[in-house]
């Protein structure tokens, strides 16, 4: 039985963010780690419920790692929590809380067992490479979800309590990724065509490779094992290829795009808890919610290129450069893209939901009987 709503199969988690519920005092901590982040520093302070009916609490933390346990990854994250509450009398109180955690972190990519064997480690991460001697990761996540909740507690009498909350959140989540057009070779070192096994079918034990195939295999094998840089992304080459394309007046060959999945969410919920008698308790509630999901790509880095046209480069070979089918935006054909511009796709998904529920709990001696019903749409 949950006094705030109907639980799912896995149960429910309810976090009390009322400032008056935090013990007065101060706390600071420093934590070390050897996984995603190296260290975390954190401070929390609370006033408790003061004589004037106010209560305040706040917390701030920072986590970071120049490089995690996986090579080429880094972690940089701050977090905050602020809450205030005013208790007007024994019947009414109003609380507000806001929190968020702006984070930037580099990712690891999965690879085949062949790539792990060639690299000599299952910690091998093909997402990074050297750019002018410094490590750069192609898959970097930026996330931030500033959130706000306002709660009104109304103790109607000894038997009934009404809790009404408004919640708002703007979720900003994006991850970068390498992109290339149909005239460029796949730059990923662990792409199957860049592995030694692409020389011939090495998995067929009954197949005898030709001299040329065997020489190709050994050349690829030596390339992979001779230098760590050879099994990572080659940023310097991608910049060079784009510079050559610039000189010829051509299109960008390699770039870094950023894929966004943002959400704007608002929820309003109200629950009435009723003690009918010593054996029976009930909860009736109404929940209203709306979410706008925004999905789009932006140009993160042109890698030195001067020109990028917003068309589907891989469809050009099937339909031709002048076909409408290759246009990502038919309202703005052949639009030139600069850093920060939206391109590729841009669409919204809107979800509106309303739920009305009732749940009842009967408790006597060793017996607990619980039932609920809800309607939503």
For the regions a protein language model found, what residue spans apply to each?
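Small-side-chain secondary-structure face that scaffolds active or pore-lining regions
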Residues: 189-206, 257-261, 293-312
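Transmembrane beta-strands of outer-membrane beta-barrel pores
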Residues: 30-36, 62-66, 100-104, 168-172, ...
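Membrane-embedded beta-strand positions of outer-membrane beta-barrel proteins
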Residues: 26-30, 56-60, 96-98, 164-166, ...
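Outer-envelope beta-barrel architecture signal
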Residues: 22-26, 39, 50-56, 90-94, ...
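Acidic/polar loop-and-plug regions of large Gram-negative outer-membrane beta-barrel proteins
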Residues: 85, 93-151, 174-257, 321-339
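Transmembrane beta-barrel wall of Gram-negative outer-membrane proteins
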Residues: 33-65, 69-108, 140, 146-156
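A beta-strand signature from Gram-negative outer-membrane beta-barrel systems
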Residues: 1-29
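Outer-membrane beta-barrel transmembrane strands
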Residues: 132-177, 251-287, 293-295, 339-370, ...
């Amino acid at each position: 039985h949950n006094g705030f709503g109907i639980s799912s199969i896995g149960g429910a988690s309810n976090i009390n963010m009322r400032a008056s519920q935090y013990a007065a005092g101060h706390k600071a901590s420093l934590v070390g780690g050897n996984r995603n982040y190296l260290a975390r520093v954190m401070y929390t302070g609370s006033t408790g419920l003061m004589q004037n009916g106010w209560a305040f609490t706040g917390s701030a933390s920072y986590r970071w790692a120049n490089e995690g346990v996986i090579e080429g990854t880094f972690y940089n994250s701050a977090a905050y929590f602020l809450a205030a509450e005013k208790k007007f009398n024994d019947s009414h109180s109003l609380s507000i809380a806001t929190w968020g955690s702006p984070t930037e972190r580099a990712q690891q990519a999965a690879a085949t067992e062949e790539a792990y064997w060639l690299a000599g480690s299952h910690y091998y991460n093909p997402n990074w490479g050297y750019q002018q001697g410094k490590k750069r990761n192609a898959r970097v996540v930026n996330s931030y979800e500033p959130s706000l909740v306002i709660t009104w507690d109304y103790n109607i009498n000894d038997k009934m309590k009404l809790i009404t909350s408004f919640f708002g959140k703007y979720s900003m989540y994006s991850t970068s990724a390498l992109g290339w057009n149909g005239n460029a070779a796949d730059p990923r070192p662990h792409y199957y065509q860049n592995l030694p096994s692409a020389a011939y079918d090495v998995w067929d034990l009954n197949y005898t490779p030709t001299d040329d195939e065997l020489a190709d295999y050994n050349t690829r094998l030596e390339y992979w094992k001779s230098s760590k840089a050879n099994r990572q992304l080659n940023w310097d080459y991608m910049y060079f290829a784009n510079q050559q394309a610039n000189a010829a007046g051509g299109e960008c060959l390699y770039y870094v795009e950023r894929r966004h999945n943002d959400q704007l969410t608002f929820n309003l919920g109200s629950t009435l808890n009723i003690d009918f008698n010593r054996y029976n308790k009930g909860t009736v509630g109404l929940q209203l919610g709306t979410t706008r999901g925004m999905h789009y790509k932006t140009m993160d880095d042109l890698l030195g290129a001067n020109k990028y046209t917003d068309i589907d480069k891989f469809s050009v070979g099937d339909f031709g450069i002048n076909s409408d089918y290759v246009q990502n935006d038919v309202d703005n054909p052949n639009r030139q893209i600069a850093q920060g511009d939206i391109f590729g796709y841009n669409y919204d998904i809107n979800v509106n939901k309303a739920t009305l529920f009732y749940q009842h709990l009967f408790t006597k001696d060793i017996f607990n009987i619980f039932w609920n019903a809800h309607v939503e749409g």
